[in-house]
């Protein structure tokens, strides 16, 4: 419904929570891939010179199903891991497979293969200092309700820190 009402890009801006998604707009002949702002639901993609695009929630899916010269390891990613102890968020250890950055939009024109990437796909909110306390409280209440909805029992690990104590207080 949101896509019908607002269009694909505006609807994606309005999404709140953990998500990664793919939308094909047949009227505009465009493919959209997008992830949540924190990258909690990752999305991996691979493209080749013939404009074949494969994507999935894990890089392993792309290794098995796509022959895009990914048998080679990404030496830069491996070097980053050995140097820094982690691989940069947009890279993977496989050559030819990348991870979409958190809060990003990847758009492909299916007619001509033009690719558009936006890593600042965020809705900026500016607050007055006086409104912060009230807005934070109502936002935290909403987020807690959204994230406590589960098919399984929910628990909290209390570390004694401010964040876990605050979350426990809102239960």
Predicted regions and their residues:
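Cysteine-centered catalytic environments shared across enzyme families
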Residues: 1-171
């Amino acid at each position: 419904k949101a896509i019908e009402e607002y269009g694909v890009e505006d609807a994606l801006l309005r999404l709140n929570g953990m998500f990664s998604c793919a939308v094909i707009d047949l009227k505009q002949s465009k493919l959209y891939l997008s992830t949540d702002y924190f990258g909690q639901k990752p999305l991996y993609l691979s493209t080749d010179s013939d404009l074949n695009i494969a994507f999935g929630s894990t890089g392993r899916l792309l290794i098995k199903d796509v022959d895009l010269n990914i048998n080679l390891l990404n030496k830069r990613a491996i070097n980053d891991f050995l140097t820094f102890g982690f691989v940069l968020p947009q890279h993977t250890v496989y050559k030819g497979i990348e991870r979409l950055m958190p809060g990003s939009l990847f758009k492909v024109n299916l007619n001509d293969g033009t690719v558009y990437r936006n890593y600042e796909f965020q809705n900026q909110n500016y607050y007055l200092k006086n409104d912060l306390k009230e807005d934070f409280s109502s936002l935290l209440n909403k987020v807690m309700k959204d994230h406590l909805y589960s098919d399984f029992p929910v628990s909290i690990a209390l570390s004694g820190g401010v964040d876990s104590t605050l979350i426990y207080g809102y239960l």
